[in-house]
């Protein structure tokens, strides 16, 4: 929990707050001003299709991951004919849960449900950095405002609305990479900590089972 709090604080300080043009803290050596860009100038919607690649899922907590790692039934009998191709570095989001943060940068090649939107970089950028940027609370508020639907359960963010959203981003590609590398190390620590906790829980359960037969 403490590491998650540290990560949240880092995200707050390493990206500009709403209405500001520079973050509270920056890495040494970077002084170039950040710039405002519409997402449509950074990404284009990809509708490439395939049915013969690994199926990927998108969630609020895990981002993009192989569906085979999920506990949920992936409905193996369903047709994959219209599934969309995802390449490493693509940004993928669940159009109906975007306002909750169901978005991420993919570390995998694969395919996703046609219900998802695949945004492919149109320029050279660090998509991992944007994976963090696009999940910030300020961005989630923008998605909610730009989503269409009669209730939160039906709110959908179409690509044309996504493309029109403005972000404040580091223009320097190397600064993008340094930010994503730093936050990536924190994510690695969080994952290791969670695995240790799960191991300890399993050990405790095993001991209790043996003690009270």
Cite the ranges covered by each PLM segment.
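Short beta-strand/turn micro-motifs at beta-sheet edges
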Residues: 13, 104, 151-155
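Non-catalytic DNA-recognition/assembly elements of restriction-modification systems
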Residues: 26-50
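IQ-motif-like calmodulin-binding regions
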Residues: 40-43, 87, 174
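DNA target-recognition patches
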Residues: 43-77
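A short beta-sheet element
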Residues: 69-72, 81-146, 158
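Short, solvent-exposed loop/turn positions at domain surfaces
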Residues: 74-80, 151, 173, 185
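A short glycine-rich beta-alpha junction/loop motif
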Residues: 110-117, 150-174
